[in-house]
Design a protein with these regions (language model features):
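PLP-dependent amino-acid enzyme catalytic core
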Residues: 1-333
């Protein structure tokens, strides 16, 4: 797959902006300053607030671009199906509703109740199947065949075009960044960042971030081959990938400087930092990039960093437990 060009990203922006406005990027003083030993970053950081979209996450952008392409390329299709842990499904549901399409969304058993409720509010048919995202995806493929629905995969060139629109907003809207941290679920976000950076001719290092409990992309990056791994995250379901997408991996291998792992405890601390310092709610996957920057803050001295807050769709009980410190993350003794 070829990354979208600057012209293609601009075309995607025209589609996206019919349904939403650009999201802000802010440099928050309390995130930036090292007020006391061990606190926050101590560097100039710019937070891209994709938690401010109408769906609460960046996934809406790709879904809008994909739906526009589907309307033109397959006008006979009357419905779509997708597998998700939440944000992809919300984006697909909202885009389908705008175009008058039926949407069937498959989620694993035990999925976030609040994300399920948000998807149902978009008028989707919600189906629970499987124990993780991969099993839900396999069932969604089966439903697509049985019911004549169009399958919206979690990685596709049109989704990358959509995510590249937020990356272009960030990179074109702030002073040149030395490094930008991007969470990796299935890969559309980090690939969109690579597309925007390349289109603008920048030298910004892109750092992908995964949960240590969902290391498939990190392992695949290091070994330069597709590696499956358990996806066990309790706090960052948006990063729960067991089987990486090979097209995404090929782009990551060529365009991303590093892929690092952050612990569940580090993600929880980043969620607390966002709320305490900016009064923004970040879901676990959305806070992973800040967790990575905090982990590497000593090596960031003298640099300007970008941090993508990919989403804020966190359940109330989970968020309350994180803020109170009562949640026992996986991987923590």
């Amino acid at each position: 797959m070829r990354l979208p060009t600057l012209s293609q990203i601009h075309d995607a922006q025209a589609v996206v902006y019919r349904s939403m406005t650009p999201t802000p990027q802010y440099s928050w003083p309390l995130i930036n300053k090292r007020l006391t030993a061990g606190s926050r970053l101590g560097v100039e950081a710019w937070i891209k607030h994709e938690n401010h979209t109408a769906a609460g996450a960046f996934k809406l952008r790709g879904a809008l671009v994909y739906a526009e392409w589907l309307r033109k390329a397959h006008p006979d299709r009357k419905g779509v199906v997708a597998a998700t842990r939440g944000n992809h499904g919300q984006g697909v549901g909202m885009a389908a509703q705008l175009l008058g399409l039926k949407a069937v969304i498959v989620v694993p058993h035990g999925n976030s109740a609040e994300k399920n409720r948000a998807m149902c509010a978009q008028g989707v048919e919600l189906v629970e199947h499987g124990q993780d995202f991969q099993e839900s995806l396999e069932y969604a493929r089966r439903l697509a065949h049985e019911r004549g629905l169009h399958l919206v995969e979690s990685f596709h060139e049109r989704l990358v075009m959509g995510t590249a629109t937020y990356a272009l907003e960030l990179l074109a809207g702030v002073p040149p960044l030395d490094v930008v941290y991007v969470p990796i679920g299935m890969g559309s976000s980090v690939c969109g960042m690579a597309a925007a950076r390349n289109a603008l001719g920048l030298k910004t290092e892109i750092v992908g971030v995964v949960s240590a409990e969902c290391p498939a992309y990190a392992l695949s990056f290091r070994r330069r081959e597709l590696v499956e791994a358990p996806a066990l995250s309790r706090i960052a379901d948006g990063l729960a990938c067991r089987t990486p997408n090979l097209e995404a991996l090929e782009i990551i291998w060529q365009n991303v400087g590093r892929v690092i792992e952050v612990s569940e405890a580090e993600i929880a601390e980043a969620m607390r930092a966002y709320f305490e310092d900016t009064h923004n709610a970040a879901e676990g996957a959305g806070a992973a990039a800040l967790a990575a920057a905090l982990k590497e803050k000593d090596s960031l001295r003298g640099k300007r960093a970008g941090i993508v807050l990919t989403g804020g769709n966190v359940d109330r009980e989970m968020f309350a437990a994180v803020l109170s410190g009562s949640l026992q993350p996986l991987g923590k003794e």
